[in-house]
Amino acid sequence: MTKRRVVVGMSGGVDSSVTAWLLKEQGYDVVGLFMKNWEDDDDGEYCSTRQDWIDVVSVADLIGIDVEAVNFAAEYKDRVFAEFLREYSAGRTPNPDVLCNAEIKFKAFLDHAMSLGAQTIATGHYARVRERDGRFELLKAFDHTKDQSYFLHRLNQAQLSKTMFPLGEIPKTRVREIAAQIGLPNAKKKDSTGICFIGERPFRDFLNRYLPTKPGPMKTPDGKTVGKHIGLAFYTFGQRKGIGLGGSKDGSGEPWFVAAKDIASNTLYVVQGHDHPWLRSRELVAGNVSWVAGEPPADGARCGAKTRYRQADAPCAFGRAAQAGDERFSLVFDEPQWAVTPGQSAVLYDGDVCLGGGIIESAATGRAGTAPAGRAPALVEAR
């Protein structure tokens, strides 16, 4: 009887390594595939590609599977990084890991795996796939503290039907135990953090290599200039560190936060205090939508939503756009949400089931009547 072939995306980390081992133990014909998605820093201090490949080969030798490397750097630059720069240039804060999953790991990678004769692909993501009544559902991981369904919400039925997440039912602590028990050479390797192509390097330094600085005024809600920014692209809503402002003598003395960007005047608005009304939103509008089931929830449906990773699901009401052909949606939250950021993803849930979501275009904050005379700075609007 021919074994079912599964191609596992292997990064050199513990999660994907244990994924490959588990599937091999379950009797699958496992092939490891290492993706190289970034080439600009092959010799830089922050590039770990060479060591990651060495770790992949070592793990493959130990568990007895074939492994190969594939270069998706061109696809990544075209489908992910170019959009990343466009969004930052427009003053928004994108999440490239969401786009990378949809366009690279579960599209380019999936296509390549099928060319190798695979019936299924698998990754080390913490999430689950469930088939019900002929449809595939994306669910949160058993270990909610490690759940990554937020980053996977743009996957469609075709992609989910060919995907396995073996770690979805396993706590992260158990994954580490398995790695140590079977003697994986990377058992103590730290989890990767940060945006995949940036790694551990200072984000502002990285962004400055691709986007020019464009200094402008930094103002308070009443129009007072309190400093100068280096360029709107280098700041995000709710940001506290790196603003360059201490507590002012005539202010509250509380920390400063980025609260709004006025693209037309190149002005960055800052406020003092974590609970300032400019940082709180009860409503948002999102576009560029993607629904796991292929269609949105019913108008007025109750659901939970995340506007950032690791955020607890916030109860809200879902609203469809009134105009025919407009796929955007609105969310009205039961409680104000903090620093809802244009460019980030609003992801909807029905319990553990991820419904999909969209890219945040705008959010209504408590700013009425507080803007400088003659101009109320609007949150950045997506195209």
Swiss-Prot record:
Family assignment from sequence similarity: Belongs to the MnmA/TRMU family.
Subcellular location: Cytoplasm
SUPFAM superfamilies reported in the protein's UniProt record: Adenine nucleotide alpha hydrolases-like
Annotated keywords: ATP-binding, Cytoplasm, Disulfide bond, Nucleotide-binding, RNA-binding, Transferase, tRNA processing, tRNA-binding
GO CC, alphabetical: cytoplasm
EC number assigned by the record: 2.8.1.13
InterPro entries reported for this sequence: MnmA-like, MnmA-like_C, MnmA-like_central, MnmA-like_central_sf, Rossmann-like_a/b/a_fold
Site residues by UniProt (Interaction with tRNA): 125, 344
Function: Catalyzes the 2-thiolation of uridine at the wobble position (U34) of tRNA, leading to the formation of s(2)U34.
GO molecular function: ATP binding; tRNA binding; tRNA-uridine 2-sulfurtransferase activity
Region (Interaction with tRNA): 146-148, 308-309
Catalytic activity of the protein: S-sulfanyl-L-cysteinyl-[protein] + uridine(34) in tRNA + AH2 + ATP = 2-thiouridine(34) in tRNA + L-cysteinyl-[protein] + A + AMP + diphosphate + H(+)
Protein name per its UniProtKB record: tRNA-specific 2-thiouridylase MnmA
Gene3D superfamilies associated with the record: Adenine nucleotide alpha hydrolases-like domains, HUPs, Translation factors
Principal location listed in the UniProt entry: cytoplasm
UniProt-listed Pfam families: tRNA_Me_trans (PF03054), tRNA_Me_trans_C (PF20258), tRNA_Me_trans_M (PF20259)
Entry annotation: catalytic residues: 100 (nucleophile), 196 (cysteine persulfide intermediate)
Domain of life: Bacteria
Gene: mnmA
Disulfide bonds: 100-196
